[in-house]
Structure formats: structure tokens, C-alpha cells
A protein has these predicted regions:
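Conserved ABC transporter NBD signature motif
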Residues: 55-70, 74-75
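Conserved ABC ATPase signature
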Residues: 100, 128-135
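Catalytic Walker B motif of ABC-type/P-loop ATPase nucleotide-binding domains
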Residues: 153-157
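Helix-to-loop junction immediately C-terminal to a conserved catalytic motif
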Residues: 51
């Protein structure tokens, strides 16, 4: 069976330092892969490679058996990538950010007020995001996960600045996505609940 996402022999060099080399990775529908490692080990760099945002120094990445380079548009439509930074428009409100994402990515209609309320943002829907706390901004950014139909999620430290209630809500979202045969790659210092039966981990060693 063709792997959903596969990386073969990946190498990444940043400022003359080899972050990782000859790295192999496979991901199937319904799987959750947690990338672990110390700061500077290359976790974020690996996610950017897997998201097609940068090019490996060696190796290749295949999605559904085909290189990313020959299916960039299809891959972008199949992917929801949320980086370490929130990626929101700080001058816009939470509601306006959701409207922007829905239009830009042709996302289906949903009740934005209800969604933001479920994320603990009730009463803040019309506040410019620059006035929100780091945790509130992160929740606005993560709202995309409840909107997107992309089967592959690549998330860099999604639990950063979230309170326990928001963490539990996000983990529930993970469960729903995996049950629908979606796949997730995540970096996090948060200990993921052991009730993810498909959870796999990959450790990146810090290289001097």
C-alpha cells in the first residue's frame, strides 16, 4: 500500500550545521506522529520541509506516492500547516480571520460564533487580534482545524500558551480527525494522552 506521506533520506543544513541527515519517515491515514527533540534539533525545520515550505538539502518527500514538486497545488489543498507563530492577521478580529481563511481556502460554512465560543473566545469575537493574549491568539489560529477538510495536519507546538481546557479541546479535535482517517504530525513539549492508539514518536538528536 502506498504511504500517505513518506520522506526518504532527508538532510537539512542550516548555517553550516547539519540538523539531520538520511532521515526516513512514513505516515499513514489515522496516524499521529509526534516529533520530539531539544530546541535547535531541527523540529521546526523538518515540519517546514514536510509542509513543502522549504527544500531539503538531500532526499525527497512523497505524498500519496508522488513527489511534492509535481503536485504542489494538490498538496497545498490537502494540507493544514500551522507554524510556531500564530499566522493570524493581528489587525483583523477573530471573526474576520475566520472569514478570511474560509474565503482563501474555500472552506465550508460553519457557525463562527459557536466555534469561537467553544474555544473560550466568547465575547472576544470582534476584538482586534493584536489586543488578545498569546493564548487567545493561538486559539484563533487553531480554529482553522475545526474548519478545514484537509486530511493532513502539520502543527508546530500547537499547545503553546493554551490552558488545560483548551488543550483538552484540541486533543478531542485530534481524536475526531484521526477517526476520520486524517493524519497529524506535531511537535510539542506537551505529553500527549496515551489514549491515542495510533501515536508514534520520532526523536531528533541535537547535532553539534
Amino acid at each position: 500500500m502506498t504511504d500517505f506521506l513518506r520522506a526518504r533520506g532527508l538532510s537539512c543544513i542550516r548555517q553550516d550545521r547539519v540538523l539531520f541527515q538520511a532521515l526516513d519517515l512514513e505516515l499513514s491515514p489515522g496516524q499521529l506522529l509526534q516529533i520530539q527533540g531539544k530546541n535547535g534539533a531541527g523540529k521546526s525545520s523538518l515540519l517546514r520541509l514536510l509542509a513543502g515550505l522549504s527544500t531539503p538539502d538531500d532526499g525527497e518527500i512523497l505524498f500519496q506516492g508522488q513527489p511534492l514538486a509535481v503536485q504542489a497545488e494538490h498538496y497545498a489543498a490537502s494540507l493544514c500547516y500551522i507554524g510556531h507563530h500564530s499566522g493570524i492577521h493581528e489587525q483583523l478580529t477573530a471573526m474576520e480571520n475566520i472569514a478570511f481563511w474560509r474565503a482563501a481556502y474555500q472552506l465550508p460554512y460553519s457557525d463562527s460564533m459557536q466555534l469561537l465560543g467553544s474555544l473560550g473566545l466568547a465575547g472576544l469575537e470582534d476584538v482586534p487580534c493584536r489586543m488578545l493574549s498569546a493564548g487567545q491568539q493561538r486559539r484563533v489560529s487553531l480554529a482553522r482545524l475545526w474548519l478545514t477538510k484537509a486530511p493532513l495536519w502539520i502543527l508546530d507546538e500547537p499547545f503553546t500558551a493554551l490552558d488545560q481546557q483548551a488543550i483538552q479541546r484540541l486533543q478531542q479535535c485530534f481524536h475526531q480527525h484521526l477517526a476520520a482517517e486524517g493524519a497529524i504530525i506535531v511537535t510539542t513539549h506537551q505529553a500527549l494522552s496515551q489514549d491515542f492508539p495510533s501515536l508514534r514518536t520520532m526523536e531528533l538528536a541535537y547535532r553539534w
